[in-house]
A protein has these predicted regions:
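Sec-dependent N-terminal signal peptides
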Residues: 3-12
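Helix N-cap / beta->alpha transition motif
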Residues: 194-207, 267-269
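Boundary at the C-terminal end of the N-terminal hydrophobic targeting segment
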Residues: 16-18
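C-terminal soluble interaction/assembly domains
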Residues: 218-294
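Acidic/His-rich structured neighborhood in mature extracellular/periplasmic domains
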Residues: 51-201, 212-215, 224-226, 239, ...
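Start-of-domain marker
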Residues: 22, 26-27
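Generic recognition of flexible, low-complexity loop/linker segments
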Residues: 206-210, 229-232
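Sequence/structural signature of beta-propeller domains
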Residues: 32-49, 53-58, 71
């Protein structure tokens, strides 16, 4: 166990140095959106991690994966990392910002993490001043639809097993104790409705010019209205994936950590990507967030 902790401490020291290097390399790039484009391009080719590569670090009660890393991402941690770097002047800035993006008021705790994009991640990060809703600013009212889902955090946690915990150095007995404690903490958690506005994929494919007024760099969320996942994860939800749209020579490309081959951060033509979801039974639309400057 001591060796495990020592290795983690060494890796954290290396990561802090990496943050400083990344930020120093980007000093001449001005503006959060421009810096977001820069850092998202820098991480193209990075491995996708289906298990979720980030946690609460060494002090984590449930997930002791690192608070940040640069060698692997899922779709959300890719966004969180890139935008945190884009807004930072040094490693101290970065540590503070990534925690604010990932956690309620920046308090590092598994149950305060923004696990649900529609219920937590979007509204909390709008409130924190990192984003603002783009749909109402760039699309007409008759082009906007609303998805609703009941988010059952207690039902989600009750689906957790010992294998859901990321606690490599703990005994089975201690893991069981922590799992029981986690379920106890959410026993009175109410079901809450999450709403998110979206533009239909089919409508965008019919009229790609709808995208023409969007900013050059924007967050895109993929909407599956009231997606029924109760049997698998214990709750419904509205959003299944996230990425960044980047305008390149008057066309939008999406950079995202993909869970299908090649399992890496990739850049794809956005309209071509949407084509595969035409008339899809559950994936109906996209939601946009404008990235705010400082």
């Amino acid at each position: 166990m001591k060796i495990f902790i020592l290795l983690l401490l060494l890796s954290f020291t290396t990561l802090a140095s990496t943050v400083e290097d990344l930020i120093n390399e980007s000093q001449e790039i001005v503006g959060v959106q421009s810096r977001t484009e820069y850092f998202s391009r820098k991480f193209l080719g990075t491995d996708y991690d289906p298990a979720g590569p980030l946690g609460e670090g060494l002090e984590g009660e449930i997930d002791q994966d690192p608070l940040y890393r640069f060698d692997r991402f899922d779709c959300t941690t890719f966004l969180e990392t890139v935008i945190s770097l884009a807004r930072s002047r040094d490693s101290e800035d970065f540590n503070s910002i990534i925690n604010l993006i990932r956690y309620d008021k920046g308090e590092v705790d598994f149950l305060k993490r923004h696990h649900f994009t529609d219920l937590q991640w979007i509204p909390e990060n709008i409130h924190a001043g990192f984003f603002k809703e783009a749909n109402r600013n760039f699309f007409k009212d008759d082009e906007i639809f609303t998805a609703r889902a009941d988010i059952d955090i207690k039902g989600w946690i009750n689906k957790f097993t010992i294998d859901s915990l990321r606690l490599p150095s703990l005994t089975l007995e201690e893991k069981q104790r922590r799992l029981l404690n986690l379920k106890e903490r959410v026993k009175n958690e109410p079901v809450r409705e999450a709403t998110v506005e979206y533009i239909k994929i089919d409508r965008i494919l019919e009229n790609p010019d709808l995208l023409s007024t969007l900013p050059d760099v924007v967050v895109v969320n993929f909407v599956r209205p009231n997606w029924n996942l109760k049997e698998t994860i214990g709750t419904n939800m509205n959003i299944s994936h996230q990425g960044l749209l980047i305008r390149i020579k008057d066309q939008f490309f999406m950079r995202h950590a993909t869970q299908v081959s090649p399992l890496k951060v990739v850049e794809v033509h956005f309209l071509n990507y949407l084509e595969r979801f035409k008339n899809h039974p559950t994936l109906k639309g996209v939601h946009f967030l404008e990235i705010l400057e400082h």
